[in-house]
């Protein structure tokens, strides 16, 4: 997971950077809504490649999805470790039991 932590740290460092100096800084400067929109676009592109069955393009789009997910988290000040902790908490539970235990509403 080191690469994801490294990428998350780089994204976090770009928060205060000049938007003209970095794509990440430019995206973050546009706000969390734009970051979420871009994540959604990349997720759809990955879905399309998964349906097509193009492995190389799916790998590439998957990398874009991970990057934009981390940008979206950073835009809302959510740490990657918080998401990983939630995954760790769910590990070992059946998906059905985990979903049933979620708060309603």
UniProtKB/Swiss-Prot annotation:
It holds the Pfam family PRA-PH. Its EC number is 3.6.1.31. Pathway: Amino-acid biosynthesis; L-histidine biosynthesis; L-histidine from 5-phospho-alpha-D-ribose 1-diphosphate: step 2/9. The keyword ATP-binding applies. It is found in: Cytoplasm. SUPFAM superfamilies: all-alpha NTP pyrophosphatases (SSF101386). One of its GO terms (cellular component) is cytoplasm. It catalyses: 1-(5-phospho-beta-D-ribosyl)-ATP + H2O = 1-(5-phospho-beta-D-ribosyl)-5'-AMP + diphosphate + H(+). One of its GO terms (molecular function) is phosphoribosyl-ATP diphosphatase activity. GO terms for biological process: L-histidine biosynthetic process. The keyword Endoplasmic reticulum does not apply. Keywords: Amino-acid biosynthesis, ATP-binding, Cytoplasm, Histidine biosynthesis, Hydrolase, Nucleotide-binding. It comes from the Bacteria. Belongs to the PRA-PH family. This is Phosphoribosyl-ATP pyrophosphatase.
